[in-house]
Design a protein with these regions (language model features):
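Helical cap/lid subdomain of alpha/beta-hydrolase-fold lipid enzymes
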Residues: 27, 143-269
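Serine-dependent carboxylesterase/thioesterase catalytic core
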Residues: 63-75, 79, 85-95, 99-203
Length: 269
């Protein structure tokens, strides 16, 4: 069975932990080796009733756009896509290709087209689900298009900043240099950093309207990013599950939370 998700710790205590911890300590606390356990999460998912749609609220046919994480493609979200279809939603892959590009361009050139198609075909507001960097993108789009989004769900997404393993940081730096070389003046000088002044970064600072259901699912065993950054600080929004960062896309406990939160968004419309 899927583990019952736990609500986040008191926001004030989480904020104090974050305030008193420097970036060097944050990096030291991250252990990428635990991520090898994600394969067990896939096996566990297939052994749970949740995966087959039992014991979770049914969908209403509304559209759900799913967005892959850093260096990922829609392909690894096949399990999530199929599961959403089974429980009654119309699932859409993001169509962004490899998530290794300026996020602002990905949203403008690919993701917005997928969102428009989902809105047209379902004739109602849609839901966004993003894993890791895909969750940051989902949160940004929710800030840009609140009139079109019923709910936004982030899975192990560093929505409050980045503190990651050294390997991931080096990979991100290499991608940033490639983006600057390929696009030149087509992107801002601080592209692919939190200091960028593009619409993508700016929209992350906007508040989510109360009419939109927001959910941030995180794991304390995250071996890629510091889990504190995957929380909003709101106990009604943050949900802790056991598991790994990579495995969050296959995590039965996370799936159970997703189903409940999507159902809540239905009742809120």
């Amino acid at each position: 069975m899927a583990h019952k998700p736990k609500k986040a710790a008191c926001p004030s205590r989480a904020a104090n932990r974050k305030k008193n911890t420097n970036s060097a300590h944050l990096e030291a606390d991250i252990s990428p080796w635990t991520e090898a356990l994600f394969a067990a999460e896939i096996l566990m998912l297939h052994a749970t009733p949740v995966y087959y749609g039992f014991g979770v609220p049914r969908g209403d046919g509304s559209g759900v756009v799913i967005i892959p994480g850093f260096l990922g493609t829609d392909l690894y979200l096949m399990e999530l896509h199929g599961w959403l279809q089974r429980i009654g939603y119309r699932s859409y892959f993001s169509g962004i290709g490899i998530n290794a590009e300026c996020p602002n361009l990905l949203v403008q050139r690919q993701l917005n087209q997928t969102i428009e198609r989902a809105l047209t075909e379902t004739e109602r507001k849609i839901h966004l689900i993003g894993h890791s960097l895909g969750g940051v993108i989902a949160r940004s789009v929710a800030g840009q298009r609140p009139q079109d989004i019923a709910s936004v769900i982030t899975l192990a997404a560093p929505i409050r900043g980045t503190a990651t393993s050294r390997t991931i940081r080096h990979a991100a730096d290499a991608i940033r240099q490639r983006i600057l070389r390929e696009h030149g003046r087509g992107v801002l000088p601080d592209c692919y950093t939190g200091s960028c002044t593009c619409n993508f970064v700016d929209s992350l600072k906007r508040d989510i309207p109360r009419s939109m259901v927001e959910t941030a699912i995180y794991t304390r065993d995250d071996g890629i990013v510091d889990w504190h950054y995957c929380m909003t600080g709101n106990r009604e929004v943050d949900f802790e599950v056991p598991g790994t960062h990579i495995g969050m896309a296959f995590n039965p406990s996370a799936y159970a939370v997703v189903a409940e939160r999507l159902a809540r968004a239905q009742s809120s419309e």
